[in-house]
Amino acid sequence: MEPDVIPAKNLVFGSGPECPTELLCLPLLRARYGLTFKEFRVTDAGGPRTVDALEAGEIQVGVLFTTDPRLLAGDFVLLEDDRHAQPAESVTPILRDELRAAHGEHLAASIDALSAELTTERLAELNRRVLLGASAAAVAAEFLTKRRHGLTPPTPRRNQPAIVVGSANFAESVTVAELYAHALAGAGFLVERRLGIGNRDTYFPLLRDGTVGLVPEYVGSLLAYLDGSRGSISDPPQAHAVLAQALQGTGLVALQPAPAQNKNGIVVTASTAAHYGLTKISDLGRAIGEPDGNG
C-alpha cells in the first residue's frame, strides 16, 4: 500500500438519509476530524441496513450506537472518538424531586448503586439478550440478582406514594426502566410501571406533570431537548453538572449518571480496521505510515 493513502478517501460511509446535514454525523466528522469520504450511501441510522451494508462491503464505515449488541461479537471495530467530538450521552435517571422528598435519600441511593454498575458493555449485553427474545423484566431481574442491588431484606415503606417508572418506546429505555423498577421494588418501595410511552415529546411532559415519577434519560439528548445550545458537551461530569443546573426550578432532579453511554459510534469491519490499521477516528484521516502524534 502506498504510504500516502488516506483511508477515508478510499472508503464509503453509510448512515441514515439525514447524516449529510445532521450536525452530529458527517458535518461533525468534517469539522472535528477533517474527514472526506469517497462516497456517502444511504442506509439507516444505526440499524440493520447499516449492518448489512458493512457486512456486504457496500460501505466500509458506518454509524452504530455504542450500546448496540452487535459490537460485542468482534465483527466490527468501534473507533475511539479521540477528539471527543460526540456529546456525552450518559444514561441518567431523572426523578421528580417531590418523590425524593417523600421517600428520603434511600430512594436515590438505591438507584445510584444500580447506575454505578451499568457500563456501556453491560448495557450492550442486556440489549443483546432482549434482542434474542428475553423479556426486559427477566433480563433486569437477573442483572440485579447477580449484583444484589435492592435484594437484601427490604425495609417496609408504608403510607408512601407509589413510584411510577416510565420509559420511552424503544427496547433499551424499557430495559433500563425495568432495572430501576426492580431495584426500587427490591428495596421495599411500591412501584408502578408505565413503559413504552413514546418519544421524548410524549413522555417528558408526563414526567413534568407528575404522571410519571422516574425515567431513564441520556444526558446530551436531554440537554439538547431542554436547551439546544448546551447539548454538545463531551465530558460526562460537566454535562451532568450543566443538566442539574438546567433542571433547577422544574421539579426534576438528575440522579447520578451511569458509566454507560449510548451515543453515535463510528464503526468499521474488523477486516477494514486491520487493513488500514484503524483504532481511532483520526486514523481515517491519517496517511498510512504517518505518525499519529501520540508518541
Model-derived features with residue positions:
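Short helix-initiation/N-cap motifs at beta->coil->alpha
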Residues: 17, 38-52, 192-205
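A ligand-binding cleft/hinge motif common to bilobed small-molecule-binding domains
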Residues: 52-79, 216-243
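Periplasmic-binding protein-like
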Residues: 44, 67-115, 241, 249-253, ...
